Amino acid sequence: MVRRFKRAVKYRRGSRTHGWGRVGQHRKSGGSGGKGMVGFHKHKWSLVMKYGESGTGWPFYGKHGFKQPQAISIEWRPINVGTLAEVVRGLKREGRVKEEGGRYVVNLVELGFNKLLGGGDVDLPIVVYTPAASRSAVEKIEKAGGEVRIVPAVHR
């Protein structure tokens, strides 16, 4: 197709910076010595010494913090009280939940969970055996006429 106007670059030929200022502007990372942490061991070493902690290069170099060993870390598998109420209703239909004094007895470890959280609403009286529970979960279970019993459990 025929072009109606000349491209702007045609007008800028011969002007050295093509309208981008006096010296060395409108470049990518060349004007700043490289992207990111490039050059911290070479031409930007003075920045590392100036802004790093006591001339050691921290926080730019070295390892920071620690990673907890898998042997002692806990893999939490939580369930909310609202979801637990639905699960108990399903187990009741299947006849897989025990009743004790008009309350349903549930062991969360047997169901594959190890923490009870307070999300949702519960309207069933449930006795819950669990290794850990949040304060709001305990309050909601007790308000519905149930009870939370904390049991020791081996994690993982």
Swiss-Prot record:
Task: Write out the entry's keywords from A to Z.
Answer: Ribonucleoprotein, Ribosomal protein, RNA-binding, rRNA-binding
Q: Name one GO biological process term.
A: translation
Q: Where is this region: Disordered?
A: 1-35
- Start-end of Basic residues biased regions: 1-16
Annotated family = Belongs to the universal ribosomal protein uL15 family.
What is the role of the protein in this entry?
A: Binds to the 23S rRNA.
What name is this protein filed under? Large ribosomal subunit protein uL15
Q: Which organism is it from?
A: Pyrobaculum neutrophilum (strain DSM 2338 / JCM 9278 / NBRC 100436 / V24Sta) (Thermoproteus neutrophilus)
Query: Lineage of the source organism?
Result: Archaea, Thermoproteota, Thermoprotei, Thermoproteales, Thermoproteaceae
Q: Which gene encodes it?
A: rpl15
